[in-house]
């Protein structure tokens, strides 16, 4: 069951990423500037983020199979519309469909994981889902780009639509929501639905999950979905093949890091925020060095940037683990939906801001951005890193205060490490 869901998610990531690797061709096809092209993706992500809570509620009611099936069909329709589009409004409508279908997929697959892999294996399988699903990005970075250059825009995106139809058929025939004997969800009234959503939001575990997802995810997402490729090719002067290889490296790093983070979360669940802070510190540090580097950054530094960004996706999965452990089973869908809003809202706002800054600093409708424009544009990330950090710190404090009331007092990390090295009883 998990394999079918994983394939559906990988294809959703492929659909989501397909425009990013074709950003330059999109500007040429639609005679659009950076702001217009970024608007395609911003609206796609806005729809994705805006539907997370409604999809989460529907998921708790209808189950994963129906939601994943609906998502696959909707994304296939969006790619077909994009294949035929010749103007900006039609292209925007196409990406809105892709965003709507994408919104139905990931948290539905996470619900499959929660039912088929209960207990301590769930964090690891959640990480594997998020990371192996990024294979779709590799398919977008290599086969899709190759097909786009060898054939045409219409043929490439029509092929993407056909892939979505095949996935929908597989889900229809092979996927089940939960093992036999699992109680089916029941319909609830509007008042009970509203009360459940309020309880989900009031839970500090949901909110720390949201801010964890925000602060760890958006930089890597922005880089992989749209602005990384132009930054590497136009801003840093890399060959297109080298840039595509770096985007693939980002995914491969995540595949390696994800299982490690999953095991660490399962082993030390009360220290998950330490992993979040470590990923954030590494991301901010390497971006600062790249943006302040005089002239174009050397290739090893860009490789380091991509390696660090590769940890962002796995880091954001920790947010779902917070929501999973702090919410009851009947609220898993809505809690995951709330968490998933964080990173994608930050991503879409960052994508839009980067496009706007590039257009302001670049005359006319030219896509020939200089390095100074890219530096200014990518600096908007610091705003969202600050917002996310404050949110994580605030809600971590609330969770730890609740633990203290329950008799669980966490030692400072340095004291816990010192105690473990001294051979004393391990602290939580």
Please provide the spans of the model-predicted regions.
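Helix-to-loop junctions at the C-terminal end of transmembrane segments
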Residues: 51-63, 257-271
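Helix-loop-helix hairpin linking two adjacent transmembrane segments in secondary transporters
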Residues: 128-179
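Cytoplasmic membrane-interface "Motif A"-like loop-to-helix N-cap segments
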Residues: 61-71, 266-281
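Helix-breaking motifs and short loop linkers at transmembrane-helix boundaries and internal kinks
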Residues: 31, 63, 84-90, 101, ...
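Cytoplasmic helix-loop-helix junction between adjacent transmembrane helices
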Residues: 94-133
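Juxtamembrane intracellular "pre-TM" segments in multi-pass secondary transporters
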Residues: 178-210, 409-424
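Conserved MFS/SLC helix-loop-helix module at the cytosolic interface between two early adjacent transmembrane helices
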Residues: 50-89
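Extracytoplasmic gate region of multi-pass secondary transporters
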Residues: 19-20, 204-258, 350-355
């Amino acid at each position: 069951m998990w394999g079918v869901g994983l394939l559906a998610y990988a294809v959703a990531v492929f659909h989501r990423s397909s425009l990013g690797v074709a950003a330059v061709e999109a500007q040429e096809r639609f005679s659009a500037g950076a702001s217009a092209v970024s608007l395609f993706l911003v609206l796609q992500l806005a729809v994705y983020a805006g539907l997370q809570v409604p999809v989460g509620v529907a998921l708790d009611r209808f189950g994963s199979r129906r939601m994943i099936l609906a998502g696959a069909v909707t994304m296939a329709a969006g790619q077909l519309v994009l294949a035929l589009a010749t103007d900006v409004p039609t292209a925007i409508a196409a990406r809105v469909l892709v965003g709507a279908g994408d919104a139905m997929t990931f948290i539905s697959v996470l619900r499959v994981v929660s039912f088929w892999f209960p207990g301590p294996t769930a964090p690891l399988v959640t990480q594997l889902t998020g990371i192996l699903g990024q294979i779709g990005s590799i398919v977008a970075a290599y086969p899709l780009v190759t097909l786009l250059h060898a054939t045409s825009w219409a043929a490439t995106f029509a092929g993407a639509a056909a892939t979505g139809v095949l996935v929908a058929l597989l889900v229809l025939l092979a996927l089940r929501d939960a093992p036999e004997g699992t109680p089916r969800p029941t319909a609830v009234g509007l008042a009970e639905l509203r009360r459940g959503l309020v309880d989900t939001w009031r839970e500090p575990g949901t909110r720390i999950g949201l801010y964890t997802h925000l602060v760890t995810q958006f930089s890597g997402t922005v880089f992989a979905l749209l602005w990384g490729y132009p930054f590497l090719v136009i801003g840093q002067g890399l060959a297109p093949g080298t840039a595509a290889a770096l985007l693939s490296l980002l995914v491969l790093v995540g595949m390696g890091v994800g299982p490690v983070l999953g095991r660490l979360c399962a082993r030390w669940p009360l220290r998950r925020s330490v992993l979040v802070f470590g990923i954030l510190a590494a991301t901010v540090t390497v971006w600062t060095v790249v943006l302040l580097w005089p002239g174009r950054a050397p290739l090893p530094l860009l490789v380091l940037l991509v390696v660090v960004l590769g940890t962002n996706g796995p880091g954001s999965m920790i947010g779902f683990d917070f929501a999973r452990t702090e919410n009851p089973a009947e609220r898993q869908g809505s809690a995951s939906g709330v968490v998933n809003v964080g990173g994608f809202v930050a991503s879409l706002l960052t994508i839009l801001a980067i496009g706007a800054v590039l257009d302001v600093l670049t005359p006319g409708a030219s896509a020939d951005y200089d390095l100074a424009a890219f530096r200014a544009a990518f600096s908007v990330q610091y705003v969202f890193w600050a917002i996310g950090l404050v949110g994580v710190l605030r809600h971590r404090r609330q969770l730890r205060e609740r633990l203290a009331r329950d008799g669980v007092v966490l030692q400072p990390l340095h004291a816990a490490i010192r105690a473990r090295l001294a051979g004393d009883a391990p602290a939580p």
